[in-house]
Amino acid sequence: MQISTGGFILEDTAQYNVFYNLSKQVIEDENTPMRRFLPLVYEIDEVKDIDEEKNWIKANPSLYVVKKIEDMRENVEKMKMAPALKQTVLTKDFNLLCNSATSFFDFEDVQVDPNEILAGVLEGKIYNTYGVCSFDLSNGGSDMSSASILVKKEGKMYCLNKCWIPASKYQMYKDWNLPIDIWIENGFMALSGTTAVEYQDIEQWIYDTCDKYSITCTLCGYDRYCSTYLVKNLEDRGIICDAAPYTTPGMSPLLYELRALLQDHRFIYNSPILKWCLLNCEVLTDTKLQVYPKKNVLKKKIDAMMATLYGFYAFRNHPEYENYLNN
């Protein structure tokens, strides 16, 4: 028997999601073969439900018995007066999983309506349309690289994403307790090369994905680093490649735009690696409230997010293509 409240999401985000989703599956599926596993999940449904005291017992079955209602009221008032306490109250008093206080995206931000990403639904939305490809390459291919394909349609942004690591890094990710085998099995990650990712694998994925869903990619956003080979090949195919400036003024509007779309449920994606990277994102904030993503934080990879942001840059930097990309 194991009892736990929610907590802050650190490097074990993906592992937590595996067990939480397993619990949800067992609860909802009467025909589950897991007869010796009985999950009991007490949580409030949404953050907004905290405003009504009658909802508090959902996450606190011992309220009025062990836990005092007066203490709960005091904590909620403290949270409203001091936003810095919000994450702690949400996790410890309402059993909502939250990201670390320094992270740019909240756990609630990155959730996607499961009906939007059912098999065939996401793919159906992006089929036979225009889109943007983008990628983020690691230093010499020695660690994770990522690519995204973005499609704007019906006021929403749809994203397909894949990541690659060299075989030499496989054990490192396993040691971090990440469900890397599940990611690979489900096609969200692939091993490429022995000590360095082979960039032609990324290039081929872009071509294959566009062919599979009849997507016409007219633009590509990317980081200049180590990109010469891939950019040349894409440009030879008539794709306009635009390097995103990795600066605070360059990154800040992209991060705010992505967060706004997520909070408005208009950014649709199905990659658990992209979710992990979003939750890993920590930012530096300047006096103008511009934000800049911190890179090279051990165990907090953000490559899938960066690849996606470069696609946002291509959209933003080429408004003349908006008519094509919205159809």
Question: Predicted regions: what is each one?
Answer:
Residues M1-V132, G141-D143, K162-P166, Y173-T194:
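Non-catalytic, compositionally simple segments
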Residues E11-Y16, S142-S146, T228-D236, P253-Y256:
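A short acidic (Asp/Glu
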Residues G141-G155, A304, Y310-G311:
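Acidic, metal-ligating active-site segments
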Residues S4, G221-R224, A244:
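Short His-Asn-centered micro-motif
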Residues V151-C217:
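Nucleic-acid-processing active sites and adjacent nucleic-acid-binding tracks
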Residues I215-C226, V231:
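Short glycine-rich phosphate-binding loop at a beta-alpha junction
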Residues Y64-V76, Y127-N128, M157-L160, E203, ...:
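Long, compositionally biased intrinsically disordered regions
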Residues Q25-N55, N233, R237-E322:
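Metal-dependent DNA phosphodiester-chemistry modules and their immediately adjacent helices/loops
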